């Protein structure tokens, strides 16, 4: 164990500060009850930073993140920023530079449907049975979103636009290794998603993933075309454990997996580099419509802490305890408004309190 874990806390906009307060409760328990040497420092980001510093990602925030072992992020892009254009740019001008600066190439999006919340899924109960637990691993810094050339032109009065899907072998290699390494901590299954019957980039993707798999003979590898994969997830999500995807395909399929859980407010995410430095955040947005009402679900932010403990601190046992605390309160029937099927639900701070109590008591 390290002598000190430095965490940069970036609450951000919208419901970010509200749910981050509940994450602090968990961090304080880790310090005071589990004796973890955690040090937190808070920094501005997003619309809040634009209001105060004129930019979405101030230099002091970036420096604070550089001097940390991990970043715990709330949300960005609140309507409070000066203009609608600035609000739309807040997420792009904060998260994207952070991902680029720290080379956060691996995006982890868990999509777990708890047996206690099966009624929330849009899928039939006979399809989802007792829930599912999928981890989408998306390559985050390559592919068609960053490929050059890209643009929009006009020739002979005909307008056209173009993008370039490009992948280098090292980009595929490192995301594949990450997927197989994580498979060994789960159920030893990886399903790689591509379109290798059409795309050259996908042919290379499949070749390299297949080659990397030889280093992990105990992990079962399968391949699916993206169109078939989207159908299979709806037909039988429980057949999957880890889905390995390119940037574009992962963007689409991770949202599909999130939607079939029926509760985006429950889902955390992580973006990692090769040294397991990570940015951890809820998968949902800043939800400005419920900002300040104390009704946001803090579970995604709390589970983001769990992912931070699991991947950047490498403390699986303690991460499991945080996850179990969430399951415990769900089994007892505690709900926030977004996952409640009646008018009786806990406020944001109340849900944070019951999860914190469950973590302390070991329930």
Swiss-Prot record:
The protein's UniProt keywords, in alphabetical order, are:
Amino-acid biosynthesis, Branched-chain amino acid biosynthesis, Cytoplasm, Leucine biosynthesis, Magnesium, Manganese, Metal-binding, NAD, Oxidoreductase, Plasmid
The cellular location(s) given in this protein's UniProt record come to:
Cytoplasm
How is its cofactor bound, per UniProt?
Answer: Binds 1 Mg(2+) or Mn(2+) ion per subunit.
Instruction: Give the positions of the site Important for catalysis.
Output: 145, 195
Q: Which GO terms describe its cellular component?
A: cytosol
Question: In which family does this protein belong, per the annotation?
Answer: Belongs to the isocitrate and isopropylmalate dehydrogenases family. LeuB type 1 subfamily.
Upper lineage is: Bacteria, Pseudomonadati, Pseudomonadota, Gammaproteobacteria, Enterobacterales
Q: Which GO terms describe its molecular function?
A: 3-isopropylmalate dehydrogenase activity; magnesium ion binding; NAD binding
Q: What does this protein do?
A: Catalyzes the oxidation of 3-carboxy-2-hydroxy-4-methylpentanoate (3-isopropylmalate) to 3-carboxy-4-methyl-2-oxopentanoate. The product decarboxylates to 4-methyl-2 oxopentanoate.
The protein's assembly and partners: Homodimer.
Q: Which gene encodes it?
A: leuB
Residues involved in Mg(2+) binding: 227, 251, 255
Cofactor(s) the protein requires to work: Mg(2+); Mn(2+)
The broad enzyme category this protein falls into is oxidoreductase
Pathway given for this chain reads:
Amino-acid biosynthesis; L-leucine biosynthesis; L-leucine from 3-methyl-2-oxobutanoate: step 3/4
Reaction(s) catalysed (UniProt annotation): (2R,3S)-3-isopropylmalate + NAD(+) = 4-methyl-2-oxopentanoate + CO2 + NADH
Species of origin reads Buchnera aphidicola subsp. Uroleucon solidaginis
Residues reported to bind substrate: 99, 109, 138, 227
| Name this protein carries in UniProt | 3-isopropylmalate dehydrogenase
